[in-house]
């Protein structure tokens, strides 16, 4: 399993974001400011805020958002001009499960990794709901006066199908993979509750691959 990240990108009326600050000469000045004083944009993280929401589970939050004061499309893989900020959302407990399979009998061949994002209908429902919640946040009077327009998915994406088409094109990995080496006591468990690999002495696995599911 892994979290898939859905984003809403907006253009601001004024240049109040980090967009363009990664280019010379600004990036050089920011680097010097950090090196000499330990301050400035280079001393900050790209995610400046966040929060949790109840999407479907009323007992505990199941959606998480992050606010980045820059236009970060597909984890930075896609560049669009202008300036603004990004709010991304993640459904915390996805039901879709992927797979990791051997490509061949050769240990040097990379494995076949299929995260199988959005395979479960509930995951698709929550991804769409997260975009609608972000839009609701952006419509609040404390923030809406700063916004010139929604750039992605854009005002034309209104129906569930239109929003899902955007998510499938622009959704990105949240880098939280788990479950390829699960911990447990059943026959399919790779490690026991002490993180010891079953059937092999003096070998433990201690990274997030031991988590059976995302929680």
What are these regions (language model features)?
Residues 121, 154-157:
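Charge-dense, low-complexity intrinsically disordered segments
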Residues 1-16, 56, 85-145, 164-215:
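C-terminal structured subdomain/cap of oxidoreductase catalytic cores
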Residues 1-81, 136-142, 158-161, 165-169, ...:
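Mid-to-C-terminal "cap/lid" subdomains and adjacent gly/pro-rich loops that border
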Residues 144-155:
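Short, glycine/acidic-rich hinge or "gate" loops at secondary-structure transitions
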């Amino acid at each position: 399993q892994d979290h898939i990240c859905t984003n809403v990108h907006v253009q601001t009326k004024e240049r109040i974001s980090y967009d363009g600050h990664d280019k010379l000469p600004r990036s050089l000045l920011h680097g010097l400011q950090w090196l000499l004083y330990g301050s400035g944009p280079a001393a900050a993280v790209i995610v400046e805020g966040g929060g949790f929401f109840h999407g479907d589970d009323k007992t505990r939050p199941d959606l998480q958002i992050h606010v980045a004061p820059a236009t970060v499309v597909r984890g930075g893989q896609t560049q669009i001009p202008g300036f603004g900020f990004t709010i991304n959302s993640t459904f915390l407990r996805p039901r879709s499960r992927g797979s990791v399979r051997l490509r061949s009998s050769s240990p040097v061949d990379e494995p076949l990794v299929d995260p199988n994002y959005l395979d479960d209908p509930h995951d698709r429902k929550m991804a769409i709901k997260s975009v609608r919640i972000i839009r609701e946040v952006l419509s609040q009077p404390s923030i809406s006066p700063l916004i010139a327009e929604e750039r992605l998915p854009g005002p034309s994406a209104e129906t569930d199908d239109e929003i899902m088409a955007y998510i499938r094109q622009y959704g990105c990995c949240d880098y939280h993979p788990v479950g390829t080496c699960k911990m447990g006591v059943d026959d399919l468990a790779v490690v026991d509750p002490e993180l010891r690999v079953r059937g092999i002495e003096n070998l433990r696995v201690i990274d997030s691959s031991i988590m059976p599911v995302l929680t």
